[in-house]
UniProtKB/Swiss-Prot annotation:
CDD domains: MFS_PcaK_like. Its main location: membrane. It is found in: Cell inner membrane. Keywords: Cell inner membrane, Cell membrane, Membrane, Transmembrane, Transmembrane helix, Transport. Residues 1-34, 94-101, 150-168, 213-274, 332-338, 385-400, 448-457 are cytoplasmic. Residues 56-72, 123-128, 190-191, 296-310, 360-363, 422-426 are periplasmic. GO terms for cellular component: plasma membrane. This is 4-hydroxybenzoate transporter PcaK. The lineage of its organism: Bacteria, Pseudomonadati, Pseudomonadota, Gammaproteobacteria, Moraxellales. GO terms for molecular function: carboxylic acid transmembrane transporter activity. Signal peptide: none annotated. It comes from the Bacteria. The gene is pcaK. The chain crosses the membrane at residues 35-55, 73-93, 102-122, 129-149, 169-189, 192-212, 275-295, 311-331, 339-359, 364-384, 401-421, 427-447.
Length: 457
């Protein structure tokens, strides 16, 4: 072995042949194996995005096909969100106890199977039930894919990589809108559910056969050193030769705690950040789900065609894809809380401008895109921020509970849209009202930068 390589190896291994696995990940160049993990996790959140947004794109055609009033669609819009709350709240502690991979596999089976069932619904009652059950799988998949991938990213570019991975969620929502603009008129609303059902079931096979368990989870739980070595040898094989033991930094401080995952979330070290993350995510999802659920319908009310309404809804989601590279890069270099706060504030401003732009179709599309860039960029960065904030022992729970509690904001956003429409609020009035949750999210995450900025890893 060359002298330089031998000296580098000594930086990782102690006299007991114990290797700091996180230091290995941080210092090694990205391997093909890590890119494979990135692709699989990207596809998971991509199909999650398609299925999450499906109801918003289907709603106008469904209302016309079944002859129901738009105000009757509120329960259908909110049903999946209710399931997502349960899925997120249950899956986090489950993943921290049994592993990320098994939770991901089961979540894809659940939301794929019940999305297919939605395609065969014959009334609103059955559709509400199937969308609720779909939501349980959706709520479990996204935070656990984010957690798993973040644990394979080097600290120097973690925010950039995870934000780019997570933009698959926004891309899935956008592609769902673009596809539905021709798929639904050609083949009916059932076709989008069929697409959104088969895709995760096929992807589940990739998860089972190609996605590894989190090496950090295996180390902290004291499980299968041989398996950890096999995983890390596919990332930096020269660094694991002769190593008999692996560790990660925070286990020296946190391992053996009697608090449990919930005790850690609400310990003095994490409680302020936990509450502020929840408030921020809640307010962000009020904005996103009001627009995701009702923007196509609102556009139809202003005279837009079905195809145009679906296109503009997809354009809003596509904005999150465009912002991923910049916001991830900025979070790795500056205070990530303040970067996100700026994006939320910009989202509220652009929402107000969108409400004033109905008379100019070109400007309307441009400002819808800008609003999507701002709010989806901020929201897609929140799981990254949460994963950075919590240690391995409670990371899946921390990310998932932020997602789960935040989903109450999604339910509220979808519900309040139906209420405001039922009370004859105009397009302009509804869009202008969104400055309130935008400002609240910006303030909450800015305060976090002052009182709870520390990263766990």
């Amino acid at each position: 072995m060359p002298k330089e390589a031998n000296m580098a190896s000594q930086d990782y291994a102690t006299q007991r042949s114990s290797l700091d696995a996180q230091a290995l990940i941080n210092d090694a160049p990205l391997s093909r194996y890590q890119w494979l993990i990135a692709i699989v996790c990207f596809l998971i959140v991509f199909v999650d995005g398609i299925d999450t947004a499906a109801m918003g794109f289907i709603a106008p055609a469904l209302a016309q096909d079944w002859g129901v009033d738009r105000s009757q669609l509120g329960p259908v819009m909110s049903a999946a969100l209710g399931g997502m709350i349960i899925g997120a709240l249950v899956s986090g502690p489950t993943a921290d106890r049994f592993g990320r991979k098994i939770v991901l596999s089961m979540s894809m089976l659940v939301f794929g199977g019940f999305t297919l069932a939605c395609a065969y619904s014959t009334n609103l009652d059955s559709l509400v039930i199937f969308r609720f059950l779909t939501g349980i799988g959706l709520g479990a998949a996204m935070p656990n894919a984010t957690t798993l991938f973040s644990e394979y990213c080097p600290a120097r570019i973690r925010s950039l990589l995870v934000t780019c991975m997570f933009c698959g969620y926004n891309l899935g929502m956008a592609i769902g809108g673009f596809i539905s603009s021709w798929l639904i008129p050609a083949f009916g609303w059932h076709s989008l559910f069929l697409l959104g059902g088969w895709a995760p079931l096929i992807l589940m096979l990739l998860v089972i056969f190609f996605l590894p368990e989190s090496y950090r989870f295996l180390i902290v739980k004291g499980k299968n050193t041989k398996k950890v070595r096999q995983i890390l040898s596919r990332i930096a094989p020269q660094k694991v030769q002769g190593v008999t033991e692996f560790h990660v930094p925070e286990e020296k401080v946190e391992a053996g705690t009697k608090k449990g995952v919930f005790g850690m979330l609400f310990s003095a070290k994490y409680v302020k950040g936990t509450v502020l993350l929840w408030v921020t995510y809640f307010m962000g999802l009020v904005m996103i789900y009001l627009l995701t659920s009702w923007l196509p319908t609102l556009m139809r009310e202003t005279g837009a065609s079905l195809e145009r309404a679906a296109f503009l809804g997809g354009l809003f989601q596509f904005g999150g894809v465009l912002s991923a590279l910049f916001i991830g890069w900025a979070m790795d270099r500056f205070n990530p809380n303040r970067i996100i706060a700026g994006f939320y504030l910009a989202a509220g401003i652009f929402a107000v401008i969108v409400g004033q732009s109905l008379s100019n179709p070109t400007l309307l599309a441009l400002f819808i895109l800008c609003a999507g860039i701002a709010v989806n960029g901020a929201q897609s960065s929140m799981p990254v921020l949460s994963a950075r904030f919590y240690p391995t022992q409670c990371r899946a729970t921390g990310v998932a509970w932020m997602s789960g509690i935040g989903r109450f904001g999604a339910v509220f956003g979808a519900w309040i849209g139906a209420v405001l429409l039922g009370n004859n609020w105009s397009f302009t009035m509804i869009l202008s009202m969104l400055i309130i949750p935008a400002a609240a999210a910006a303030i909450a995450i800015f305060v976090k930068s002052l009182v709870a900025h520390t990263d766990a890893t």
